[in-house]
């Protein structure tokens, strides 16, 4: 899988939705508290970006697997798996690698901060996966966008402030 296919699979242009609250929280903490923790910033950045890309790839993969009509309505152009003739194995490999990176960097962030990050991380990862996947995905429910807005708008913003202010690292 080439870089262009990967970027289309993870819909890189949509990552602004998760990066905006992350960067806003960081700018706020810089302005209000004059604090910035490079290590925590980078750990959360990588974890957040990898997880966002993984959930988008999962969504595209499930759309590909569940497609009833595979022609028309721009399906051939909009689904990267079809457009670039990506193998299921390569798509699943990308998803697994992104999830491993997201979890790994998330655990490192938790170890560098506090259990609050772990608890919110577990809840956020669960909602992110269940948003697209499961017997009844959250996105198909009437309150799907409320869940999305709460986690993308509040939890990411809160954590992006919290990681810079928390001084009680579990691992020193």
Stretch-by-stretch model annotation:
Residues 25, 29, 33, 59, ...:
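Membrane-water interface at transmembrane helix exits
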Residues 51, 55-99:
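Aspartate-rich (DDxxD/NDxxD/DxxxD) Mg2+/diphosphate-binding motifs
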Residues 17-19, 58, 69, 93-94, ...:
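Generic hydrophobic alpha-helical membrane-span motif
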Residues 1-21, 131-144:
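Cytosolic-side membrane-entry/anchor segment at the start of a transmembrane helix
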Residues 79-168:
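Intramembrane alpha-helical segments
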Residues 22-24, 28-61, 118-129, 169-172:
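Membrane-embedded alpha-helical segments that form the functional core of polytopic membrane enzymes
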């Amino acid at each position: 899988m080439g870089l262009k296919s990967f970027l289309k699979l993870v819909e890189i242009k949509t990552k602004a939705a998760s990066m905006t609250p992350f960067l806003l929280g960081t700018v706020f903490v810089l302005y209000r508290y004059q604090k910035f923790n490079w290590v925590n910033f980078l750990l959360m950045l990588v974890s957040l970006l990898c997880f966002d890309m993984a959930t988008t790839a999962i969504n595209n993969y499930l759309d590909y697997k569940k497609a009833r009509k595979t022609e028309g309505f721009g399906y051939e152009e909009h689904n990267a798996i079809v457009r670039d003739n990506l193998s299921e194995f390569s798509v699943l490999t990308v998803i697994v690698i992104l999830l491993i990176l997201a979890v790994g960097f998330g655990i490192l962030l938790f170890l560098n901060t506090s259990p609050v990050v772990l608890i919110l991380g577990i809840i956020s990862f669960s909602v992110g996966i269940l948003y697209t996947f499961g017997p009844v995905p959250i996105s198909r429910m009437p309150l799907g966008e409320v869940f999305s807005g709460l986690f993308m708008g509040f939890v990411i913003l809160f954590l992006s402030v919290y990681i810079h202010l928390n001084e009680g690292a579990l691992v020193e």
